[in-house]
Amino acid sequence: MLAALRGKGTLDRSSILGLYRAFMGVGDAPKTLRRDTFTDSAQRVKKLVGELPLYYTEWNMCANFSAPCNDTSMQAAYDLHVILNSDDSIDGSSIWCFSDLFEEFHQFPEEFHGGFGLMTQSGIKKPAYHALRFLNEAGDTAYEIPHGDSVDAAVFKKENETHIILSMLDFDAKDGREQINISLESDEPSAVTVSKIDADHANPLRVWEGVGRPQVPNRSQLSEIEEESAPREEALPFEYRDGKILLNTDIGANEIRRIIIRR
């Protein structure tokens, strides 16, 4: 679904991109989009089409080609929220679009300019790309679990692994964290890891800023950005008691956690 943005935020007017954002009133988050706009729409359309297959072939969080949130974990959290909560209504979908190389609009010179893509024009993977990769790697067998009010959760079985994906979409980006306690009946695991997408992990925008915001990164800079912003697995402490795995983590606004339990 498409939306305009709320709040003008802090905008740099010294460049074409900054002037465009100021002229368009581009802020940091959608202002006309509810968390469940896509899900509610898909459910209504599914009732209309009945047994016919339903595909959403072009969707995204924001219609502004320059919105800062398109380059952040907010986009990733939105994509996961839509996918995890629309699976019963739609048969397939395609996020619009894969790359910031967008033929319908001129290209801004900045590598990170709020483009629609899952990757920048030089191929740097954004947080949304990694979030969808988490889903792709999780396997095809999903467990039925209750939906929470603020945190989206999904559990998948893949051979000798269990993948748990957590996401917390919050357009207002409020402070505060949710504590997640997990109890899972299972054989004793050999290892439990967590991968994070947030301000400090899998955030290529921050790494790009750290290397001087090059408009066209050279090969060395591209390699550094890719390496530093790739999600990493970290050991997650756990207990195994009475045939159950007990573990906990926390999550904040527009953050994502991928937990893998290996046996």
What is each model feature region?
Residues 1-85, 89, 111:
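Noncatalytic carbohydrate-binding groove/subsite architecture in carbohydrate-active enzymes
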Residues 41-54, 85-92, 135-141, 238-247:
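A structural motif corresponding to the C-terminal end of an alpha-helix
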Residues 1-10, 92-102, 197-211:
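Short, solvent-exposed beta-strand-terminating loops
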Residues 147-150, 176-178, 232, 241-243:
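Residues that act as N-cap/strand-start positions at coil-to-secondary-structure junctions
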